[in-house]
Amino acid sequence: MAPSARIKRILILGGTLEARLLAEMLAGRSDLSVTLTLAGRTAKPLPQPVPVRVGGFGGAEGLAQFLRAEKIDALIDATHPYAAIISANAARAAEAAGVPLLALRRPAWTKVEGDSWIEVNTIEEAVRALGQAPRRAFLALGRKELQPFTAAPQHVYLIRSVDPVDPPLAVPHAISIAARGPFSEAEDRALLKRHRIDVVVAKNSGGTATYGKIGAARTLQLPVIMLARPALPEVASVETVEEVLAWLDHAIASSVARGV
């Protein structure tokens, strides 16, 4: 849906580096009122440059009600590429409330020479792809995706997350590291070598902030079990923060020209 009214109030569905960068670039604009929403899954989120709303909306209907009540003029979905439910709710809510929606979707990674990827569609497939023989696996996944690996307790698992895994992974050998990225390729290469990792399990998150482990696996000639992205709603989308800014500026200029 293209913007048809004067855009002043913007809601950003966040939780990604791109959402934070977008908020930073909009924070100083006196012509806009920007709110950033976070799901609330991180105990101590980073400070944000604009007002923040933490927590869910209660599905698509709840989000639509919020858009109407707060008189939101534009909705930017800058959530993680694997936040399929949130993106689907955003699409339905925007349509119901008559609010223009733009999705900011970073491009997926693609294989380059030297990569050894085993591509899977589900976490359960990733567990099976590890095989029966004991391995040392780096699980570069969200905390919610870890529990299926209890079905394969013979492996040693290395887990790195901002907050502790709760409940802990119920396997004999799980190593948890609390750390907040981004991490460089050199840092991830050192991590993989230090823990003698022989396979990486990752989401195809795209972007540069978490690519270090992919480059490190390539350098160390380690296989990567890559979880494919989920299907996302077909809505207007761009790949960069700069394109979002251009979309907003065009919408604002168009509304001014129409005298809205």
Regions found by a protein language model. Name each.
Residues T35-G58, E113-S116, P168-A174:
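N-terminal beta-loop-helix "entrance" segment that forms/cooperates
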Residues L36-K44, L104-T110, I123, R143-L146, ...:
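Short, polar loop motifs at secondary-structure junctions
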Residues T150-P182:
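Histidine/lysine/aspartate-rich catalytic loop segments that bind and position anionic ligands
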Residues V50-E70, A178-E187:
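Glycine-rich, highly charged phosphate/nucleotide-binding loops
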Residues E124-L158:
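Internal active-site segments that recognize and position negatively charged phosphoryl groups
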Residues I10-A39:
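N-terminal basic/disordered segments at the start of proteins
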Residues H195, N204-A216, V224-V260:
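C-terminal functional extensions of proteins
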Residues A64-E124:
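Glycine/small-residue-rich loop that forms an oxyanion/phosphate-binding "nest" at active or ligand-binding sites
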